[in-house]
Amino acid sequence: MAFKYAIALSGGIATGKSTVASLLSLNGMRVIDADAISHDILDASSLWVRENFGDEFVDGVSVNRSKLGTLIFSDNIAKKKLESFLHPKIRAEIEQRSIKQDSFMFPYLIDIPLFFESGAYDIKESVVVYVPKELQLERFIKRNGFSREESLRRIESQMDIEEKKKRATWVIDNSGDLKHLQRECEEFVEKIKAKYLEKK
């Protein structure tokens, strides 16, 4: 059975989840990256994307994720169509990798951006990368160059970050600088080790 030792790593758009995943990895945690799996599956499905959404969403053999993202965030039918195609494939790959990680009998992370929204993963514990919504919006605009309205629309297409914070087993606060974030990540890893060693 998959997910026995899994901890879901989640957050919101522009909360710094990728940075946290890298820092936790440097601190010895093993990470399965759902986004990377999704990108690989999407690129391998460029023909399907071309047939279902049009030629303009494929550059050569790769899917133009930026263009497709703009469509998905503005068209709910297209979003559901893509999700119903991708999600079972992503889940199957994550499950396969999870079974392999479970064989080490030590906690590991599965980086799942829409963990709470999808409800597709039977993972008991979670850690959320948190920043207050206004800072999340500010960082997203700075990173992506979208208008405030477009940025808000994308952020609000996901569950509110405060709600995710409430549901999480642990919270990593990313509202400070990199040094603060490094400390938060180190403390989280120590908590996991302490909890796991207690169980042993």
From Swiss-Prot:
GO molecular function, one term: dephospho-CoA kinase activity
InterPro entries per the UniProt record, alphabetical: Depp_CoAkinase (IPR001977), P-loop_NTPase (IPR027417)
Chain ranges of the DPCK domain: 6-200
Highest taxon listed in the record's lineage: Bacteria
Binding residues annotated for ATP, in chain numbering: A14, T15, G16, K17, S18, T19
Compartments reported by the entry: Cytoplasm
Pathway: Cofactor biosynthesis; coenzyme A biosynthesis; CoA from (R)-pantothenate: step 5/5
A single Gene Ontology CC term: cytoplasm
Pfam family, one: CoaE
EC number(s) given by UniProt: 2.7.1.24
Any one of the GO BP annotations: coenzyme A biosynthetic process
Keywords, in A-Z order: ATP-binding, Coenzyme A biosynthesis, Cytoplasm, Kinase, Nucleotide-binding, Transferase
Keyword Nucleotide-binding: yes
Catalytic function, reaction form: 3'-dephospho-CoA + ATP = ADP + CoA + H(+)
PANTHER family: BIFUNCTIONAL COENZYME A SYNTHASE-RELATED, DEPHOSPHO-COA KINASE-RELATED
Family indicated by similarity: Belongs to the CoaE family.
Function noted in UniProt: Catalyzes the phosphorylation of the 3'-hydroxyl group of dephosphocoenzyme A to form coenzyme A.
Protein name as annotated: Dephospho-CoA kinase
Organism field: Sulfurimonas denitrificans (strain ATCC 33889 / DSM 1251)
Name of the coding gene: coaE
